Amino acid sequence: VDRRSAILPPGAPEDVERISPVEASWRYLEHLIEAWDHVVAKGDPELALTKQSVVLTVPASFDASARELTTEAAYAAGLEDLTLLEEPQAAFYAWLAAKGDAWRKEVTAGDVVLVVDVGGGTSDFSVIAAVDKGGELVLERVAVGDHILLGGDNMDMLLAHIVEQKMIAEAEEAGRTLELDRWQRISLQHAARGAKEKLLGDGKAKSAQIAIAGKGSKLVGGTLRTEVTREEVQQAIVDGFFPVVDSAARPATRARAALTQLGLPYAQDPAVTKHLAALLARHADALPAQGKKSPKLLRPTRILFNGGVMKSPLLRDRVASCIDGWLAEEGVEGARVLEGADLDLAVARGAAAYGLARRGRGIRIRGGTARAYYVGIEGAVPAVPGMEPPITALCVAPFGMEEGTSADVAGGELGVVVGEPVHFRFFGSSVRRKDPVGAAIERWKKDEIEELAPIEVDLPAEGRTKGDVVPVTLRSSVTEVGTLLLEAVPLQPKKKDERWKVELSVRGHD
């Protein structure tokens, strides 16, 4: 998917204007800027939002390309003093701020905090460890989940489908034929969301009424009504999206059709608990092993919930009990839920707390990049029919590379063509924690290193002939904003400090 192309909203009629994801982001940000300037700044240019230090939150699972695009949208909206923060970290910062100094009584050295953030469209997981370093308690983000497009919207769609089938069955019993149009289905999905929140909330409601407008001209008489029960919602949402599984469960994948509609890479398996099990197993060695036997999964001792979906006590209890079952399999105690979080406002409040922590007013979570990043180097071999040239993954940024640091990539000479666009293949790994900058990886296990969007380079000739191959080395750095920057440095520069920024392409692989 080209995230600069006009693909939103997906599935919209032809007469609806479409915009790109990047444009959608900066339009939202522009609206927030205008609202701030109207309500807070009130015409004072010094108080304008574009004059402030802004912390913008993103999913922890955002790769380098997605972070680059987010930054681009923010700059387009006029936000220049910008820092990116992962949303699960923001939720934890909010919890720290709410607890004050008392947080040290609930999280101590050796604790492992699993942040489970399930919102409307995504499920985002992070693991933060409390580590004793020289007598000082340090917080480190040690693991991040995949980018999972799975959340409350999926649950609303399922519940709306169930309710639609009930309406059709009830109409047939009354001798009528019912077929909902596109707009009625959208309305039904909104109504289903309200019923879901009511029946999964703290209340004791046993059922909820759902009503949408009919197609007729009668406003009241044309209304379609039915009822959904607490048991139906629990079966659909709790058991469907949060099933009780063992720690060996993994998200199911299916073979994709030869022809697939272009769009977002939605999760194929709706079971959030399976995605959680996969995360904890994949990062089992993220921390030093306690004892002789290596653990089968990363063992959280604390759980922090965030996101609108997790406001439901039924869902929180299901996730916590499932994790406790996995820990019991490992022979360790269950995890304790950290209470006191505001699941609606935690990310915003945590972003503000992080901004203060950057100024020395609070503890900071260490972590750096959530992945190691690599460029693909194609081997120079004779062409053979049916045989692809071997690819070596050259590490350009190690796992955990901190903000404000940089490194020269020692991987031999790389030749790039000047005066025309060229591409580097780009890879990432959330599990290879020990690869240093310049490491050349010739073989790797399935799912250990994944291919990301390619790196797209357009180097101006700068006094060279168009099409020349210029020997370069790469220099990587993590900016203070929180994005990965790659630069190509010519071995024989035409001018002092000559270097080119290597842009991260926005074209993902389907």
Predicted regions and their residues:
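Conserved phosphate-binding/catalytic loops in two-lobed NTP-binding clefts
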Residues: A77-A90, P265, V319-G350
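Conserved phosphate-binding catalytic cores of ATP/NTP-utilizing and phosphoryl-transfer enzymes
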Residues: L84-V116, A281-A284, Q290-S294, L345-R364
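Short glycine-rich, Thr/Ser-proximal phosphate-binding strand/loop in the N-terminal lobe
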Residues: K133-H161, K496-D510
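Gly/Thr-rich phosphate-binding beta-strand-loop-beta motif of the actin/hexokinase/Hsp70
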Residues: V1-D2, G100-R141, D468-L491
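Short beta-alpha connecting loops at secondary-structure transitions
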Residues: L139-L150, E172-L180, T260, E329-E339
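Hydrophobic, small-residue-rich alpha-helical packing segments that form membrane-like cores
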Residues: D37-D44, S53, A60-F62, T70-T122, ...
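Acidic low-complexity intrinsically disordered segments
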Residues: E80, G201, I212-A286, G362-D510
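Gly/charged contiguous loops adjacent to phosphate- or pyrophosphate-bearing nucleotide/cofactor binding elements
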Residues: D2-E23, E46, L150, N154-I323, ...
